[in-house]
Amino acid sequence: MVEVEKKIKEGLTFDDVLLVPQYSEVLPHEVDVSTYLTKRIKLNIPIVSAAMDTVTEARLAIALAREGGIGIIHRNLPIKKQAEEVEKVKKSESGMIINPVTVKPDTRVKEALDIMAKYKISGVPVVDEERKLIGILTNRDLRFIKPEDYSKPVSEFMTKENLITAPEGITLDEAEEIFRKYKIEKLPIVDKEGKIKGLITIKDIVKRKKYPNACKDELGRLRVGAAVGTGEETLDRVAALVEAGVDVIVVDTAHGHSKRVLETVEKIKANFPEVDVIAGNVATAEGTKALIEAGADAVKVGVGPGSICTTRIVAGVGVPQLTAIMEAASAAREYDIPIIADGGIRYSGDIVKALAAGASAVMLGNLLAGTEEAPGETIYYQGRAYKVYRGMGSLGAMSSRLSSDRYGQEKMEKFVPEGIEGRVPYKGKLADVVYQLVGGLRSGMGYVGARNIKELQEKAKFVRITWAGYRESHVHDVQITREAPNYWVD
C-alpha cells in the first residue's frame, strides 16, 4: 500500500492556492491584458466563450468580440445553421465589407426586405449582371411602401441619381469625412469600371469608436470561432464554416487525447491549412503534446472541471484544473503553442490563477450563461430571473445527436450522460460581466507586479492554503446586505 501511495500524484485546483503579492510598480489600469489565442489570432482580453448551446450563438459572440474576446459557436446545430451564425458575426460590422450583400434591379421588394431582415442591415446596393453599381436601396426608400408594392422590382424604389461612391484604397478616416459632408449612411466602394468592390457604413464607423477594444480580423470584421466534432460530416461542416468566414475551428471533445481526435485534427489541417485549429480537451502533458504534433494551433485543457460536468463522478476520470493547466503548459511551452483553460472558473481571481499557471486564455461557460446575450431560455423562479444552462454531455444536449460524439456516444441508443441541466441567475449585459472579470484580472496582475500576461506567468508565486485559509479568504462572520457584482456565495 505504501508503494501505491508513492505513485499517486497530488492534484490542485483554484481554491487550493493563492497568488503571493509582490513588489509592484504597476497600477491595475496600466496593465496589458491582451494575449494570443493562437500564434496568428490576438485577443484584447483573454476570454473565450464556451461552445455550448446555452452559451454561444451569434448574439453573444458579437458582444464578446466587441469587448476584445472571442466566441465559439456551438455545434449542436445543423451545418447550414451553424455557418449562418458565423456569418452573422462576420457581417455584423466591418471596416469595409468586402463582399457586401447585393440585389439585382429585378429583385422583388419583399425578397429585398427579407434579405435586409436576415442580415440586420438597413440597405443593399443594387447591381447589374456584371456587378456594376446602378443604385442603392435603403430603409428610407422603402419607408412608405404599401403591401401591393411588395411584388414590384426594387428598381422602382432604389436611389439611382447622384450616387456617392468612393474608390478602392480609401481609408476609414477619409470615409468618415465623406459621410459627414454628404450626410449619407452607406458608401459603396467601386473600381474604375464601376463594379462594386466593397461597402462602408456609418454604423461601422460609429461602432469602431464605440468599441475600440474589439477583436477584429485584418478586414475589420469581428472574429469568431466554431466547434466541430469527429463524426463523418466533420469536413463538410468545416468547409461550410470556412466559407462563412470563421477565424478558428475548435475540435471539441471530452477526451482529446484519443486516436479519433488526433486524426480529425490532421485531416482538418491537411484540407484547410489556412484556418487555425484548437483541439481538446486534455488534462496531461502527454495529451497536449499529442495534439500539438497532430497540428493543433492551440490546446484546450480541462477534463471534468465545469460546473455542469459530471465526468469525474460518472467516469471517475479527470485532473484538478490548476494541475492540469500547469502540466499542459509545460508541454506546450516547448512548441510555443498557447493553451486555453476550459472550465472551473468561478471568480475573476480564478482567471488570474489560470493565466499565472500557464494558460494564454480562459474559456467561460457558467459565468457567461446568465447574460442577456446567451441563447439559454430565461425562466422565473420565486420571483427571480434565471437562464437555462446545461452541459453538452447532458441528456438534453446529447438527444439531438449532433453533440453526442463529443462523449463518444453517437451510435448508442441510450445515453450515459456526463453533464446536467440547470439554471444560473440572470446577470444582465455581457459587457458588464466582462468589465468585472477583466477588472479582477487587472487587480491581480497589479498585486503581482505584472505589466502583461507573460510577466504574470514569469513572476507568479503560488502558496497552497488549508481549508481554514480558504474560509478566511471568503466573506465570513457577517451577513451580506448589499451584493457586489463580482462576488457571490453558493
Curated annotation (Swiss-Prot):
GO BP: any one term: GMP biosynthetic process
Cofactor(s) this protein cannot do without: K(+)
Active-site residues, Swiss-Prot/TrEMBL: C309 (thioimidate intermediate), R406 (proton acceptor)
Taxonomic source organism: Aquifex aeolicus (strain VF5)
UniProt EC number: 1.1.1.205
PROSITE patterns according to UniProt: CBS (PS51371), IMP_DH_GMP_RED (PS00487)
Positions annotated to bind K(+): G304, G306, C309, E472, S473, H474
Record entry for activity regulation: Mycophenolic acid (MPA) is a non-competitive inhibitor that prevents formation of the closed enzyme conformation by binding to the same site as the amobile flap. In contrast, mizoribine monophosphate (MZP) is a competitive inhibitor that induces the closed conformation. MPA is a potent inhibitor of mammalian IMPDHs but a poor inhibitor of the bacterial enzymes. MZP is a more potent inhibitor of bacterial IMPDH.
Pfam families found in the cross-reference section: CBS, IMPDH
Family: Belongs to the IMPDH/GMPR family.
Domain of life (superkingdom): Bacteria
The keyword NAD is assigned to this record: yes
Assembly mode: Homotetramer.
Pathway: Purine metabolism; XMP biosynthesis via de novo pathway; XMP from IMP: step 1/1
Recorded catalytic activity of this chain's protein: IMP + NAD(+) + H2O = XMP + NADH + H(+)
Matches recorded under HAMAP family: IMPDH (MF_01964)
Record keywords: CBS domain, GMP biosynthesis, Metal-binding, NAD, Oxidoreductase, Potassium, Purine biosynthesis, Repeat
Gene3D superfamilies, sorted: Aldolase class I (3.20.20.70)
Positions of NAD(+) binding: D252, G302, V303, G304
Taxonomic lineage from the root: Bacteria, Pseudomonadati, Aquificota, Aquificia, Aquificales
Signal peptide: none
Annotated GO MF terms: IMP dehydrogenase activity; metal ion binding; nucleotide binding
Domain CBS: 96-154, 158-218
Record's protein name: Inosine-5'-monophosphate dehydrogenase
Residues the entry annotates as binding IMP: S307, D342, G343, G344, G365, N366, Y389, R390, G391, M392, G393, E418
